[in-house]
Amino acid sequence: MIETKRIYTTQNVYDALQDRLRFIFEEFDNIYLSFSGGKDSGLLLNLTLDFQKKYFPNKKIGVFHQDFEAQYTVTTEYIERTFQKIEHDVEPYWVCLPMATRTALSSYEMFWYPWDDTMQSAWVRPMPNHPYVINLEHNPIATYRYRMHQEDLAKQFSRWYRSSHEFKKTVCLLGIRADESLQRYSGILNKKYGYNDICWISKQFKDVWCASPIYDWSLSDVWHANYKFGYDYNRLYDLYYMAGLKPDQMRVASPFNDYAKDSLHLYRVIDPEIWAKLVGRVQGANFGAIYGRTKAMGYRNLTLPAGHTWESYTKFLLSTLPARLRNNYIKKFKTSMEFWHTVGGGLEESAIEELIAHGYNIRRNGISNYTIMKHSRIIFVGKIPDHTDDIKSTKDIPSWKRMCICILKNDH
């Protein structure tokens, strides 16, 4: 088991970033930055360009933007402003290729396809018109496959970038911060594919790496730096603030994915013209806007149809789905069951004691690597419970009810 712990230093995050950027510029031949239009990648872009102009003026970096078609108008305006400002100082790549992007809104569509050439009349917004836009009519990425997954497209871009720059050692800079989520914290601290024992650089392919040089920045650090240096940023965050969203709800992402669906209704208020096009673009958009922010599918208040257990109702719902989607759920559920039967999830002692008190057949299986607090791993012995409504201290335990809600929320 790999032990990880946070080590605090007297160096502030800005100075640490300067040291990391110097290492990157001295260590790697080819550097490009992935710019999403969000606060983190936007800040990293500005800080990196300031550093490059001051210390490495002859080393031009690339800027990669993966465009998902459906977004707020203010986001498009910010991205346009940014590229207009930097296009002569960087190698710009604005990618608008058809790609498979997950949607959490439809029971019958696992993916939707930004910039789908067969749906051009329904596009949410026009294709950007710049010489550096990469689309089906202008696509130098030889390893691109039509409608490939968005993650694969980003990876293939990095592979192509290396090959188009003399096959030299290449790094992609990412605006990822560890305090955004435990998953990101764990990912950044994954040393298995690290670069020379540096936890914030990880390997993609041969001579292609990803670096997260602001991984230890906090949310307040990001906004303080924007204010201190007077950087431009996506004004969507101002609109989110005025709409009453909490900082962890303010995401610049595809409006149809899991992270953004709960705030989908804001499109109707903030950007009604785009909203009208969203409804016609992806099945379930209107439903998601109505129900995504309610408790219509809340865990505690969902009741079973008469004559069903949660297990039988889950299996009934699975039988109504298209084969491809049904198989995807079955695979996901089997993986979850195997995890809880053989590995176990980390739970607080209060939750463990409550499970034992209520007669659940569980046992300990060491310490969890997925929790910072080093909670005990708990395995469920025998059948997965039908529901765990009697357990009040946690919802993060397996049950057929939880799987049922997963289907009802289109969480595939």
Language-model features and meaning:
Residues 1-32, 41-412:
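Nucleotide-activated chemistry modules centered on ATP-dependent adenylation/adenylyltransferase
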Residues 35:
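The Walker A (P-loop) glycine that initiates the GxxxxGKT/S ATP-binding motif of P-loop NTPases
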Residues 38:
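Conserved G/P- and acidic residue-centered "switch" motifs that form tight phosphate/ATP-binding loops
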